[in-house]
A protein has these predicted regions:
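Structural transition elements
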Residues: 14-47, 63-68
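Short, well-ordered beta-strand elements
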Residues: 53-62, 85-87
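Periplasmic-binding protein-like
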Residues: 1-23, 68-69, 172-180
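Beta->alpha turn/N-cap motifs
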Residues: 90-91, 108-113
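Extracytoplasmic/peripheral linker and loop segments enriched in polar/acidic and small residues
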Residues: 5, 26, 43, 79, ...
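Short, polar/charged alpha-helical segment
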Residues: 68-80
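Glycine-rich phosphate/diphosphate-binding loops that line cofactor/substrate pockets in enzymes
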Residues: 49-51
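Paired acidic/hydrophobic, glycine-rich loop segments that form the ligand-binding mouth/hinge
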Residues: 104-109, 180
């Protein structure tokens, strides 16, 4: 996260702190993100039966802002013993392909109305999973925080609503539904 933010340039880009942007109502600053640790990743790969590493294919956008981040990710993955094979396609084609559930990993950047519910619903509620009739942008097929996302929508106490959003973020991070990389300073 930090390396990508540094590459893209502060103050416009900062390392992300959660699965929703830091300027959103309901943002949780420390949901339990793990640090970048290539040695630990290699050890975990070996323990999982991949002592020589692992290869993952990823369809990526040729759009400049996406392509550079994908190349940085490729280098970071390589440090951990993971070969990220990028298949770069034109941006509109990429949007079509990622909605066909073809990627194990999808890098995505988004701007939405600054309230946690929109991000949590579109990216992490099971009804938004790619392949469903109600699909939005849940590329990971995450379903661990549906209860909290739904409860927050109808909660009338703002403090309780924010706590539901915080708990949803903790669960999403704990289950690695997403690894947030950067946030823009817009």
């Amino acid at each position: 996260r930090e390396q990508i933010a540094q590459f893209r340039g502060e103050p416009f880009t900062r390392a992300a702190g959660s699965v929703i942007p830091m300027n959103n109502l309901g943002y949780l600053a420390n949901p339990g993100l793990l640090p970048h640790d290539p040695a630990k990743a290699k050890a975990l790969l070996a323990e999982a039966g991949y002592p020589n590493g692992l290869t993952i294919k990823m369809i990526g956008s040729q759009m400049g802002s996406y392509e550079t981040v994908q190349q940085l990710l490729q280098a970071q993955f390589q440090q951990s013993g993971i070969t990220l094979e990028l298949q770069q396609v034109e941006h509109a084609t990429w949007h079509q392909m990622i909605r066909k559930d073809l990627n194990a990993i999808t890098g995505y950047s988004a701007a939405r109305f600054p309230v946690a519910d929109i991000y949590l619903t579109q990216f992490y509620h099971s009804a938004s999973s790619i392949g469903k009739p109600t699909a939005a942008t849940n590329f990971s097929h995450c379903d661990v925080a549906d209860k909290e996302i739904e409860a927050a929508r109808t909660e009338t106490d703002p403090a309780k609503q924010i706590e539901y959003w915080h708990e949803a973020q903790r669960k999403i991070v704990a289950h690695v539904c997403a690894v947030p990389l950067t946030a823009t300073g817009q």
